[in-house]
Amino acid sequence: MDLASAFQEALDDADVMLRRGAPRAEGRGESPARLAFGTVVRAAPVEEGGELVVLDWERKEVTATAPILPREPSVEDDPNPRGNTRGCRGIRWHDGELLAASYHTLERYDASLHRRGTLSDGLMVGLHEIETTEAGTVWVSSTAIDAAVEYDLSTGDQVRALWPREHPHLQNTLGLEPLALDKSADNRLRFLGPTASNDDSHLHLNAVAVHDDRVFGLCNAHAAIVDLTNGTVVVQDEALQGGHNLLIAPDGTALMNDTYGRAVCVFDLARGRRVRTIDLTRYEWVRALIRPHIPSYWKEEVARKAGWRADSIARPLFVRGLTRHGDHLFVGVSPASILQIDWTTGELVDAYCYSTDVRVCVHGLAVMD
């Protein structure tokens, strides 16, 4: 984060501390009966890095939990101080089954979180968000190797893989070079260190979405939404830098979480531009959630900037996790909480806090109706 961004963040946090935000709306409208969400715990040991949770949304009661961690193969040493292999990433509810991504495997559960099996492959490396299709396949964003890979859910076979760093047009547009990779090998534990992610060509492809028979990817290292099928940059916007999650509505409207800007951003893919921003700090419920953590965050952040500490700092209101149910958006934040926002009005209509530990963040979200 540069000095100007840090100064603006400090001003925003001062506003959060000093002023009240907008109240919750009175009417909640139609809500799903159940949600599933995954958590990631910053700087935790691998075995304590996160879990999959099923929540009765109406009653705000947790009905089942399951720890999520990389196993078979297990990770004995994670060189990333934040915990690169930790927790439960993207999740999807598909045909009566919950799919939950660990670092290199899709864990498969029933609605009560009884484990039904796994799907893993040598090209599943640093998984983030996933997308299921009506054809019975699942796309995974294999972030560590900048690939989008499709698998058949019934057989586990690989259907196809898209490699944006190898597409000539994207190489010219974004200045990319292919990743040195043996695609036939088991790469699941070969990219734990920072070398590949520090490369200038690294895209950090962390979300995939299928729309009009095309596959789109969020490449946040280059602040871009990319048509992976045709190899074209559809949108470039500063809000995409470091962003997470990608939903595309039938009309071509794309939604993503501006993780550091603490907002949900809306893009018109046809016009290639941002058309709306929903600032999550406008809501008083959110301000009350993060106020207790802001003073300690800045104390630790100043110490880190001064070189007095080197460990990772958990940021209040780190935005991850996004799904849609009718006119409502469900947005995940830290400390691990879920916001229900009326898409048409921008009002906060409901919310739920799972943990007050600022290190715990929601990552994946799925409606189970």
Locate the predicted segments by residue.
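Repeated scaffold domains used in trafficking and secretory/extracellular systems
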Residues: G21-E26, E72-G90, V125-E131, Q171-T173, ...
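Residue-level detector of Asp-centered blade-edge/turn motifs that repeat once per structural unit
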Residues: E30-P32, W93-D95, T132-A135, V210-D212, ...
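Conserved beta-strand positions in repeat-built beta-propeller and related beta-rich domains
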Residues: F37-E47, L99-Y103, V140-I145, F216-A221, ...
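Short loop/turn segments that connect beta-strands within beta-propeller blades
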Residues: W57-R59, D110-H114, D152-G156, L228-G231, ...
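Blade-loop segments of beta-propeller domains
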Residues: A64-R108, H114-E131
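Surface loop/turn motifs at the tips and blade-to-blade linkers of beta-strand repeat domains
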Residues: A66-P70, P79-G83, T118-L123, L162-R165, ...
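Loop/turn-rich, solvent-exposed surfaces of beta-rich toroidal or solenoidal domains
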Residues: I248-A249, T253-L269, R273-Q340
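Blade-level signature of beta-propeller repeat domains, shared across WD40, Kelch, NHL, RCC1
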Residues: S334-D369
